[in-house]
């Protein structure tokens, strides 16, 4: 099996050459996404890099701040940190932690993390988390701070994100869900808190292909896991879908370009594609070529 870091850097170079502007890295139980983003950002200076997204359970703000500031210094200001609530299944099954009060934990995590990444110090004592720096926690080179985004789609997480974060990273949320539910709730929360207009980085599962039926059937299997998670099931329904694959963007160049425009019109400030390898290398490259043209 090929070295994952080497393969990722190679793909990132290809993405830059295709005209893409950013590369985002998920976090599971394998590679450390902030480290991966830092390496890619150093090796491929034309790309913005980000993490989408680190669960707030099983992590501590002090450690995540160290990772994020190091990645920001390594990339000279091109790193973006995404956080997520995570799921009950992975939190309790993987970390052995009770999945309790996730919204309160997100609020405390963001509050402490903002202090750390902005000021290089923290003196936060909440109900669930404590983050205190007896010595400075600033990483030279990361003085500008780190953009904080949240994989938020529900009403409560959108409220917290609007108040405390710089934006959101909704996944499997189609244009209808963005326009009618997500964007209004997030924008209202940000305005009430006196915050700037938030970024809405729509994460879209999609690919350019001529074999639409077969690829959508394959996507149905790949994405079925998300249908078991209440927050995803809800946003899929809000998007007008029954299955997660109903929200996937699959079709020829004209179809995919039109869907990207729909996301933009619905309020997405950035559109990021995932799963572009599902139909093979030729269609992945075809997808990247289109997205590079749209980005240009």
Can you describe what each PLM-predicted range is?
Residues 1-296:
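Active-site-adjacent structural elements that line small-molecule/cofactor binding pockets in enzymes
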């Amino acid at each position: 099996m090929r070295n994952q870091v080497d393969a990722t850097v190679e793909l990132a170079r290809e993405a830059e050459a295709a005209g893409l502007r950013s590369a985002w890295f998920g976090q599971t139980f394998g590679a450390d996404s902030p480290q991966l983003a830092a390496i890619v950002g150093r090796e491929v200076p034309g790309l913005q890099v980000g993490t989408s997204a680190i669960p707030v359970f099983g992590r501590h703000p002090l450690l995540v701040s160290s990772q994020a500031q190091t990645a920001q210094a390594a990339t000279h200001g091109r790193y973006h940190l995404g956080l997520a609530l995570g799921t009950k299944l992975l939190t309790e099954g993987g970390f052995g932690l009770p999945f309790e009060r996730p919204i309160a934990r997100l609020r405390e995590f963001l509050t402490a993390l903002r202090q750390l990444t902005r000021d290089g110090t923290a003196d936060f004592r909440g109900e669930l988390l404590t983050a205190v720096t007896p010595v400075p926690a600033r990483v030279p080179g990361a003085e500008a701070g780190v953009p904080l985004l949240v994989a938020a789609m529900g009403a409560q997480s959108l409220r917290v994100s609007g108040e405390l974060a710089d934006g959101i990273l909704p996944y499997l949320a189609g244009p209808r869900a963005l326009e009618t539910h997500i964007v209004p709730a997030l924008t209202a929360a940000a305005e009430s808190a006196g915050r700037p207009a938030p970024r809405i980085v729509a994460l879209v599962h999609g690919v350019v292909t001529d074999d639409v039926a077969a690829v959508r059937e394959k996507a149905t299997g790949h994405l079925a896991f998300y249908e078991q998670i209440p927050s995803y099931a809800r946003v899929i329904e809000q998007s007008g879908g029954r299955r997660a694959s109903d929200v996937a963007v699959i079709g020829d160049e004209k179809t995919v370009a039109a869907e990207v425009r729909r996301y933009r019109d619905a309020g997405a400030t950035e559109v990021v594609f995932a799963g572009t390898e599902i139909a093979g290398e030729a269609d992945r490259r075809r997808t990247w070529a289109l997205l590079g043209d749209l980005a240009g």
